[in-house]
Amino acid sequence: MGLLRVAFFAAHFAIGLGLPAASQDVTLTSRDGKISISGRLLTYDGEFFRIDSEFGALTLDGSGVTCAGVGCPDLQGFVAEFTIAGSKTMGDVLLPALIESFADQSSMTLQRIVTDDAHFTYVLSLPDTGRAVAKIGFRLSNTDGGFADMMAGQADMVLATREVTEAEASAAKEAKLGDMTQPARSRIVGLDGVVSVVAPNNPVRAVSLDDLARLFAGQIANWQEIGGPDAPVYLHMMAADSGLAQQFMRKVMGRSDLQLSENVMRHGTAAELVDAVAKDPFAIGISRFSDLGNARRVALHGACGMDFAATRQSLKTEDYPLAMPLFLYTPARRLPKTAREFLAFLRSPAAQRVVRHVGFVDQQVGEVGIERQGQRLANAIALAGEETPLDELQRMVTVLRPAKRLTVTFRFETGSTRLDAQSRGNVILLARLLEAGYFGGRELMFVGFSDGEGDAAVNRKIAKRRAAAVRTAVTNVATTLKPSELSLSIEGFGEALPMACDDSDWGRGINRRVEVWVK
């Protein structure tokens, strides 16, 4: 009722000034009949009215007012309506599957009304009466189109395979949709990854990020240059406005400051791309982890001998450097109750099972024992510098041996202390698990690691400070967590457990991280 009181105060104050009344389509009157506000009805979500009045946009609790006028909704037969726009990658299968599961969990029947492949509507109804409760419309194109639809007032949620751009965030602010860069404006529905793919009979098993960029810039034109046969390289890529292509340009080509070759063959869908690559032993394409078809993924190779394969675990932990979170963005306005319930459902275990079932990577938190991390420990010993003595490695193993690593990991944006998008989502994910008592009676250790640049002792201190900062970020979100319910400790091992070589920005970025261990 706070907004209602504010609205009534504004109305009372303005009426006292004798402001002229305008022709409006609804009038909302308090239950005692003492105060009325007229305006153009913007939305009604089944609970709250939002009107454009002479005092600006006001939101009023429907339980405290009566509505009169031609614009008043049917309160008894109200049907919540909202539209989801954006990436076909997410909208073709993933979101429909999630809506079907949501309807089942909510004991509602579901009907799909199709206009065409990109435009369709789901109608959720009560099973006993058949009365429609909600209509969820879809406008599928790509991430760019989804944000454009939201700016134009044609969408309430945006499906995005990349983060919002500065230009889009600025336009959203101008449109009074809120700050799209803030965590509250987006959530990660699931995970995917940018992967390079080749035909099954291509002998190349791994390629460095630098060579991958040079391949797609046309600087490497023969497979022989990267250990393959003496044959020309044929390049395949998705359409330039696809989220996948944009991610590749930012994370791979942008880091190398290279331009894409004009000889790249473009494809409208990932299925078409992997099919073309699988049939050509001399082709290489950029696809998604979730779209492999008959092609074979190529691992990323580090200069110091470490390879990074895209797996469900490495995408969850971001140990694979080209992880691709799947975002759902919402504006800073109140959505219908059914929409809010659907958003809450997306964080449930049931939703994450759906994400995995349809081929994407879920965010269910797993535990990895140290016995399954032999390669990491071997790398730590092999790459340990002079400033990482044996006793420090022994201390690390002693601390971590009785614990298990969670697949929740925290990494930072390039050249910044700000957590990257997936890690910001992990803050909320871990906080919700803590509040739910998921780790009750156990100890969580936030363990910081660094790259190998600079003094080792200083790096250990920096790593420990990062671990403390991440712990604070998580506990600030987990507002219902009582300190007595769980032990949350911090530790810093600096450069003692490298995940990648320090000879590149992306390698150093992988090494600068905070892991979470539980025992």
Descriptions of predicted regions:
Residues D25-F439, K464, A468, T472, ...:
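Exported/periplasmic ABC-transporter solute-binding proteins
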Residues F412-E413, F446-D451:
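Short loop/turn segments at strand-loop or loop-helix junctions that form parts
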Residues M1-G2:
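N-terminal hydrophobic targeting signals that begin at the initiator methionine
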Residues P20-A22:
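Signal peptide processing junction and immediate N-terminal pro/mature segment
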Residues R5-G18:
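Bacterial N-terminal signal peptides
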Residues L140, G145, F449-K519:
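Periplasmic OmpA-like peptidoglycan-binding domain that tethers envelope proteins to the cell wall
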